């Protein structure tokens, strides 16, 4: 997902028309995952190309936040050249200070959302506006 391509043919999208890919542009970023059972010698599969940001969505409660998952996502984001954004949900159900303090040294953009505060989503929208995103989380 995310490859930029050049097409030829009928690009109207009407039924019974044909178009084809004639070129695939170079990727500016690539998020990959490793595969142990793939024939490719690199053992990797591209998940998304040309993304700008990775939004790491984490519930603070029900279930509790898993810092290992956050850490793995951060490593993948930095490796792929993506800007990580940490989005914490269910902040009305748990204390978030300890988690925020743990990731403060990374200088991450962090958004805290609450179901009873619709305005808390505005900052997340602002950070993601006009950008190609990859969302990860539980």
Predicted regions mapped to residue ranges:
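Short amphipathic alpha-helical segments
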Residues: 67-70, 98-100
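Residue-level signature of catalytic and energy-coupling elements of molecular machines
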Residues: 2, 77, 128
